[in-house]
Structures are given as C-alpha cells and as structure tokens.
C-alpha cells in the first residue's frame, strides 16, 4: 500500500490516497463519520447503511505509514533512523513513538516552499537522519530543529 508507494518513488500517490475525499480514499471514511478503520473503502453505502465490518484492520497499514513514511520514524533493535517524506498537500505532520529507549518525535511543517523539521531523540540514543533533499546526518539526544 502506502509504504510501497513511498519506497518505489510514488509517495505523491500515497498522499493522494490519504487526502482523497471519495472512495478509494481515507477521507471518504472520515467524511462518513468513521472513528475506526473499515473492512472496505465503502463500508457504508450512499444511504448510510453499513454493509461490511466498520472495525477491521484490513487497511490499517495507513497508521504505520503515517509513522514510518510521513514522519519517517524507524526504530529497530535499538537503532533509530528517521527519513520523513513531507508533502505540501498535507502541510504538516508530527508523530511521537514511545520506544523502549524513550520518546521519539519527528515532525515537519511547510512554510511557503520551505520545510522545517523538528526531531526529539531520547537519552542514550542517536538518530541517523535522511532528508528528501539528500542531506544525511546523525543527531544526538535532545530536541533539534533543522
């Protein structure tokens, strides 16, 4: 789904799917009052009648994509990599993950054409950061604005 779109260079397609108000699109469910992930894109028909499960994780990978794709948090076996994928259509995003090492925060915000990144790295951990423009660097523990 959305993660594959990012990894194959189609993050713009994943963002369109995220923000599209018609099915298939995540905002379709929200527009119909969803507070859970539905089994199908059109879990409620045009008359407001549910016809599939309205609490089903079949499309739940979107949550992982928001953390790992949009905000770029990847914490595995005590190592932290952050590679956010900002998109102007969303405007801003921020995610916090309570890892065994402590709270990890990654966020970004557009201001015109410029993107500002904010990261919070817990004590005793460093983060290898890769930005979309190709910059790569390591962050020490603490709060950082780039």
Annotate each predicted stretch with a short phrase.
Residues 12-146:
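Non-catalytic C-terminal accessory modules of carbohydrate-active enzymes
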Residues 1-5:
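Short, small-residue-biased leader/transition segments that mark boundaries at the very start
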